[in-house]
């Protein structure tokens, strides 16, 4: 097969992939992987493995995706491609899968190696995907600075490389918004959601916008509007079931369980979680649950009590405990008033100027600043502003 033919096949697979037409995309990607194991087609082969692995994960076939990447590693070693820039695709895919399996240290090594190779080869797709995955992994580890630096690197590169918008990449802006939500910066996440809604307008539910919709569902739950989140998730669940995207379905059901729980609809919450556990257990999904934090842990305890996939729920609760023992704690979210004060501090306002701006007593401003210091674990204005920037608060 010629290189032009392989490139056309890969691009056609991407077109199907972005439309959510996984069956034809999968066939084309496997054709590329099968025929492309020669030096001239190396980049096509490794990028096809990356795409196929992501597709398999979305379908819920986590173990098959991992085997595909492990086979890819053997191919890379056999062909002497391990230092080739295109091998970065494979390493980023492995890092993503190992992260879901909660092997965070190995995941970080693969992601960092993939990013390095992407830089060496000047491939923005590898670098963007690697940084987005690394940002979320650093968040999982409680490394706020590392998470901020990684997502900032991804966003900067997306801004400079217009072509990246036409390649299947993890959406950097969605992950930035997820980080804001996790850190309690709902104002920034809300601004992102408003801009996203204006850019898209009214649209049918599609796989292309799935990450955005799931992020908005998380935001709605965090804002205390679980009913709106439930409505959004209902449409997403219908589409995912119809398309056989069981990996996506696990995440959606987990969020649906949280939305039900927030409305005190405990039986429905437990049923949604039980379905998610049923789909997840054979494949070993872990971080999809852990990433939702304490609320999902509470539901997992309920699953144990009611004997709904209790064995797997206990495994996940054990993983929660182990993560809590090793990860750095994230700071307590700032109140809206504390955020206002921090942003004025970052703008160079004195205590008196802040008091004038917000119609507060200077003593009240000092109290808010001390609360900010305590929550961010800092001791000065300079440190508070720096920490706030790391968290995307200012």
Name these PLM-found stretches.
Residues 3, 39, 43, 83-85, ...:
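Residue signature of alpha-solenoid helical repeat architecture, marking inter-repeat boundaries
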Residues 1, 30-41, 70-80, 112-123, ...:
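Amphipathic alpha-helical segments of tetratricopeptide repeats
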Residues 191, 298-337:
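Intrinsically disordered or compositionally simple regulatory linkers and C-terminal tails
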Residues 4-21, 44-61, 86-102, 126-142, ...:
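Tandem amphipathic alpha-helical repeat scaffolds
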Residues 267-285, 294, 307, 321:
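TPR/TPR-like (Sel1-like) alpha-helical repeat modules
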Residues 318-379, 383-394:
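Helix-turn-helix DNA-binding segment
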């Amino acid at each position: 097969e010629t290189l032009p033919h392989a490139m056309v096949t890969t691009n056609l697979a991407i077109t199907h992939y972005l439309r959510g037409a996984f069956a034809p995309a999968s066939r084309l990607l496997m054709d590329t992987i099968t025929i492309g194991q020669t030096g001239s087609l190396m980049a096509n082969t490794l990028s096809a493995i990356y795409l196929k692995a992501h597709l398999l994960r979305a379908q819920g076939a986590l173990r098959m995706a991992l085997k595909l990447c492990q086979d890819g590693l053997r191919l890379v070693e056999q062909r002497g491609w391990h230092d080739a820039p295109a091998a970065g695709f494979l390493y980023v895919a492995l890092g993503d899968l190992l992260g879901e399996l909660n092997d965070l240290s190995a995941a970080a090594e693969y992601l960092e190696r993939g990013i390095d190779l992407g830089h060496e080869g000047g491939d923005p797709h590898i670098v963007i995907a690697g940084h987005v995955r690394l940002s979320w992994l650093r968040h999982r580890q409680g490394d706020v600075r590392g998470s901020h630096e990684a997502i900032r690197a991804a966003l900067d590169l997306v801004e400079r490389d217009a072509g990246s918008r036409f390649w299947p990449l993890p959406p950097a802006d969605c992950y930035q918004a997820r980080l804001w939500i996790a850190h309690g910066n709902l104002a920034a996440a809300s601004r992102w959601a408003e801009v996203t809604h204006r850019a898209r307008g009214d649209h049918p539910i599609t796989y292309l916008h799935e990450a955005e919709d799931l992020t908005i569902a998380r935001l709605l739950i965090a804002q205390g509007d679980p009913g709106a989140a439930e409505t959004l998730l209902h449409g997403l669940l219908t589409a995912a079931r119809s398309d056989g995207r069981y990996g996506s379905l696990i995440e959606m059901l987990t969020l649906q369980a949280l939305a039900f729980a927030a409305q005190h609809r405990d039986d429905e919450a437990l049923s949604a979680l039980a379905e998610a556990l049923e789909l997840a257990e054979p494949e070993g999904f872990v971080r999809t649950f852990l990433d939702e934090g304490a609320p999902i842990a509470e539901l997992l305890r309920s699953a144990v009590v009611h004997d709904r996939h209790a064995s797997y729920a206990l495994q996940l609760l054990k993983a929660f405990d182990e993560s809590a023992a090793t990860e750095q704690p994230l700071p307590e979210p700032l109140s809206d008033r504390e955020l206002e004060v921090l942003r004025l501090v970052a703008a160079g306002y004195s205590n008196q100027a802040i008091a004038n701006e917000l119609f507060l007593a200077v003593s009240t401003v000092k109290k808010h600043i001390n609360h900010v210091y305590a929550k961010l674990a800092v001791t000065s204005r300079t440190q508070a502003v720096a920490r706030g920037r790391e968290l995307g608060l200012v």
